[in-house]
């Protein structure tokens, strides 16, 4: 990787409605997976790149997001830490607008590219998928602001449709929240030995948990109202992340290649 390209320590992958990059410097990045628009800024004295997950010209649906391009762009700009934001439906009755710090995931996706290694076998270890240091920083930030949160398991579905009641009944046996974008991001980050963690906001109750019809409007409405809060949480967390990585994420790819 060209040293001149290493302009960021930390990457933020913004989900639906995330617009905290609007006043930042645009920085297009060419990757093997296409062109990615990134935004450079400084938060709490740390160099940060913000990458809108769904792009901007159009809202790319979750099953067609350029996950490889986004993670590669973060890596190519020098980021070793990645924080993602995503919206989730709750299968545990979490209040709408509340936050979940993810601690594990289950993958129900089907057709999206999920690895950088199509021509060789790489069995990357995901026994601890989310970086403990970033997760600790997120918990610190939430607690500092007196914001209630939970930790939980994330089920990722293919989308773009919402889930059926039967699917939610099945997934609720194993997971706490459900979304459409957290995988393969987390795996791709592991393949590049990056630290990765997610801050999820509950935007609705999952299908069948209430009698209310699920709509995309409620997702954008909840996230829109929480924009200022999300940015403050991320800012405090970014300032708390250790400058030197002491977690095992940096060794994720060791011994993985056949």
UniProtKB/Swiss-Prot annotation:
InterPro entries: MTAP, Nucleoside_phosphorylase_d, Nucleoside_phosphorylase_sf. The keyword Transferase applies. It comes from the Archaea. GO terms for cellular component: cytosol. One of its GO terms (biological process) is purine ribonucleoside salvage. Catalyzes the reversible phosphorylation of S-methyl-5'-thioinosine (MTI) to hypoxanthine and 5-methylthioribose-1-phosphate. Involved in the breakdown of S-methyl-5'-thioadenosine (MTA), a major by-product of polyamine biosynthesis. Catabolism of (MTA) occurs via deamination to MTI and phosphorolysis to hypoxanthine. Homotrimer. This is Probable S-methyl-5'-thioinosine phosphorylase. It comes from Methanosarcina acetivorans (strain ATCC 35395 / DSM 2834 / JCM 12185 / C2A).
């Amino acid at each position: 990787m060209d040293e001149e390209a290493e302009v960021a320590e930390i990457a933020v992958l913004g989900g639906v409605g995330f617009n905290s990059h609007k006043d930042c410097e645009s920085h297009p990045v060419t990757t093997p997976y296409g062109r990615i628009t990134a935004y450079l800024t400084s938060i709490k004295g740390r160099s940060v790149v913000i990458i809108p997950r769904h792009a901007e010209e159009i809202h790319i649906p979750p099953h067609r997001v350029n996950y490889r391009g986004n993670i590669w762009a973060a890596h190519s700009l020098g980021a070793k830490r990645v924080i993602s934001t995503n919206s989730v439906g709750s299968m545990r009755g979490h209040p709408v607008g509340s936050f979940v710090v993810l601690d594990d995931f289950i993958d129900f996706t089907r057709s999206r590219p999920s690895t950088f290694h199509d021509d060789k076998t790489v069995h990357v270890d995901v026994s601890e998928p989310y970086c403990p240091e970033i997760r600790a920083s997120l918990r610190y930030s939430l607690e500092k602001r007196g914001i209630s949160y939970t930790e939980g398991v994330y089920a990722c579905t293919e989308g773009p449709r919402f889930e059926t009641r039967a699917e939610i009944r099945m997934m609720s046996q194993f997971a706490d929240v459900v979304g459409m974008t957290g995988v393969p991001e987390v795996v791709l980050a592991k393949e590049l030995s990056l630290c990765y963690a997610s801050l999820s906001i509950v935007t609705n109750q999952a299908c069948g948990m209430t009698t209310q019809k699920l709509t995309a409007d409620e997702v954008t409405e909840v996230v829109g109202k929480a924009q200022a809060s999300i940015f403050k949480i991320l800012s405090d967390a970014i300032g708390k992340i250790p400058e030197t990585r002491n977690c095992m994420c940096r060794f994720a790819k060791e011994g993985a290649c056949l």
